[in-house]
Amino acid sequence: SGLVRLDEEAGAVIATYNAFAGSLVREHGLRIGVDPDSTLITGARAWQIAVRIVEERTAPLPVDRPGAAASVLLALEGALSENLLTVDEAAERLDELVALMEGIGSVRGCRTLVRGAPEALTARLGMLEAVAAYRDYKRRHALLDFGDQIALGCRIAEEAPEVARQLRERHRAVLLDEFQDTSVAQIRLLSALFAGSGVTAV
């Protein structure tokens, strides 16, 4: 399960953030339409899938070599998961950034400051399309990667308040080690589950 029972009588449990989120997905994934028996894939398997996605694309990507493009795809997909963004949300923000760069370029004396930026940003939309294909592949084959665990766990915590209530009753005190306060996904997951209860972060 990814969890290690330290003291059966006291009910103490220790887990990494990913293992804890993964247990939420296994126990409550059906609440958000996720197969609880989904397979957690390794980084190597994720890279193989990403290479396949890249090689099957007919539209050009901003990175030519399949291996390099796959690495960029996975990094981008991980960033979206970390910030709990859908591909559509990221594309919308990218469009806004393109419009901003074009606006700056239209100001007298500022064109050289943003030369090539709108075109480079627009090219990134193709990479977002590849990310969408990668996510669709995982969904169709009931696969999860490590980034999915916390993102899906967060969805469960926010959309199923009864789960949070059960966990707060089960774990009266929570100690967070090496908590990443820059991680949107971690903050939202743990806030949805344990805000207002006995939580200590170190």
Annotated model-derived regions:
Residues 13, 38-46, 50, 116-202:
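Conserved helicase NTPase motor core
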Residues 4-5, 30-33, 111-114, 129-133, ...:
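General secondary-structure edge motif
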Residues 1-81, 85, 89:
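Conserved P-loop NTPase-based nucleic-acid remodeling module centered on helicase motor cores
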